[in-house]
Design a protein with these regions (language model features):
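Short, aromatic/His-centered strand-loop micro-motif at the edge of beta-sheets
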Residues: 131-153
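Flexible glycan-contacting loops in extracellular carbohydrate-active proteins
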Residues: 176-208
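Extracellular carbohydrate-recognition regions
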Residues: 26-51, 221-223
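Extracellular glycan-recognition surfaces and repeat-rich motifs
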Residues: 41-68, 73-75
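Beta-strand-rich interaction surfaces with strong enrichment in secreted/lumenal proteins
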Residues: 77-83, 138-144, 184-185, 198-199
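Short tryptophan-centered beta-strand motifs in secreted/extracellular beta-sheet-rich domains
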Residues: 37, 91-93, 148-159, 163-169
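Secretory/extracellular carbohydrate-interaction modules
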Residues: 62-64, 68-135, 218
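Extracellular beta-strand elements of beta-rich domains used
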Residues: 37, 210-214
Length: 223
């Protein structure tokens, strides 16, 4: 019996270790915020959105509505939404754009307000990156597919004396990655802020955003 007990303990430890690099998304928890744009009038922006900059507006393609950032001017544009949170929160969305020749857009989701953290796909660098403000603090290689919806998940949780950022992306319809793709540990306490979406239309093509969701995540959860 003692041997069986030891085996059970070992199995539990192995399971915890395997879960160590997985996003602790609270998929079953009631969202803190959701927006699919279906109830928003075409040409408008949903009530409660704070447009940092950019001519964002709701567009419709068939039966689907989404928020679109036009392909000009060329700059960085964003929108803040949902409640202001410091940690224990995740943001998810799907984003689509196209390249034009050798010119590529860049886009992503963010947490902790306008100057907080950002999970960004940068096709021109073939990278998935985490930004803190305007500084890239973590990066991993990533091959983006032009014209496909890219699914984003990004979260921040406090674990001990650090705040852990973790993110992953995948093409809609493909299998969601089981593991975190890019992460960053910040020893500096962040400020509370709203979730966000961002776009840089460097390819002069529109960037489209849909299915924005903010959820709570248990603090101290292993990443």
């Amino acid at each position: 019996m003692k041997m069986v007990g030891q085996m059970c303990v070992c199995a539990a430890l192995v399971a915890l270790a395997m879960a160590g690099n997985r996003l602790a998304m609270a998929e079953d928890a009631k969202p803190l915020y959701e927006m699919n744009f279906e109830q928003t009038e075409v040409g408008k922006v949903p009530e409660g959105f704070l447009v940092v900059d950019g001519a964002f507006e709701v567009k419709q393609e068939g039966d689907n509505k989404f928020l679109e950032l036009p392909g000009a001017p060329l700059d960085s544009f964003g929108v803040l939404f949902g409640p202001a949170e410091k940690s224990g929160v995740s943001v998810s969305a799907r984003i689509r754009s196209t390249n034009k020749g050798r010119r590529y857009p860049a886009f992503g989701v963010g947490l902790n307000g306008q100057s907080g953290y950002r999970l960004q796909v940068s096709p021109g660098k073939k990278a998935l990156e985490i930004y803190k403000g305007d500084l890239v603090v973590s990066s991993t290689p990533y091959e983006w597919k032009s014209g496909e919806w890219t699914m984003f998940q990004f979260q921040i949780v406090k674990a001990g004396e650090v705040w852990k950022l973790a993110g992953k992306v995948w093409v809609q319809g493909a299998t969601e990655p089981a593991q975190v793709m890019v992460s960053y540990d910040d020893k500096e306490e962040p400020s509370p802020g709203r979730a966000s979406i961002w776009g840089n239309p460097f390819a002069t093509t529109p960037i489209q955003f849909d299915d924005l969701t903010v959820r709570s995540v248990p603090e101290g959860k292993a990443q």
